[in-house]
């Protein structure tokens, strides 16, 4: 078995283990039963997100994955309820740290694109959404993407119908140190956002809504080569939805938010593996 080449799934798990060691402690408290570590839970939840499967199916597949279990140092397989409870306990702050850590080895260049998309939250049960009076059945998800590596730098999720210009300042403030150029479509045309970007030494490349000939002139002077790189954000949105699903399975809004961050973490790990394969000959994989 040792002579077999590493599969993409095994390399993903090994990479996720490294990130989990950087992001979380070994155990939640010193009073933990120490049967499974927090890091094992984090990696298994990322694996669940990558395979877009259920807790029960993931546990069933782990039985037939000896090399994956060895990479995780699993002596026994956790029950589905154990993973479900771990997902409840791991707060959003943990997943945001993991998202930041997943960028550590990626050659980001600071040219970013911001755009919003929607994920369905009524996937599991239409009856449930009607019974709970869930009038807004989509989650508005704003991604800040590095256009050089297609990595997700940050994510903002809301259950409301906030305008893009209300969301973007929060994302910019949180990631000011990582942004040199901010590209966005006309939905982000706001003077306050441009002023905020310049205050943080960020070059805003945002198209103006064309109400006057002056606005048309400003748009004509935009650096089109640089501005058009914002399309990478749409590419990332489409890739995440295609590979990991355009929906969330959880019913609680705070778990739905975490689920979307996990999708972004998994996407970043995949991008890191793809870039490393471009630098090294991975044709045998």
Predicted regions and their residues:
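Basic, short loop/linker segments at the boundary and entry of helix-turn-helix/winged-helix-like folds
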Residues: 2-50
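Structural motif
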Residues: 30-39, 133-134, 251-260
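Polybasic low-complexity intrinsically disordered regions
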Residues: 33, 39, 50-53, 83-200, ...
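DNA-recognition alpha helix
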Residues: 56-72
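Major-groove recognition helix of helix-turn-helix-like DNA-binding domains
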Residues: 70-90
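Helix-centered, glycine/charged polyanion-binding patches within enzymatic domains
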Residues: 181, 186-252
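Charged alpha-helix within mobile-element recombinases
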Residues: 229-240, 257-269
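C-terminal domain-tail junction helix/linker
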Residues: 249, 253, 259-285
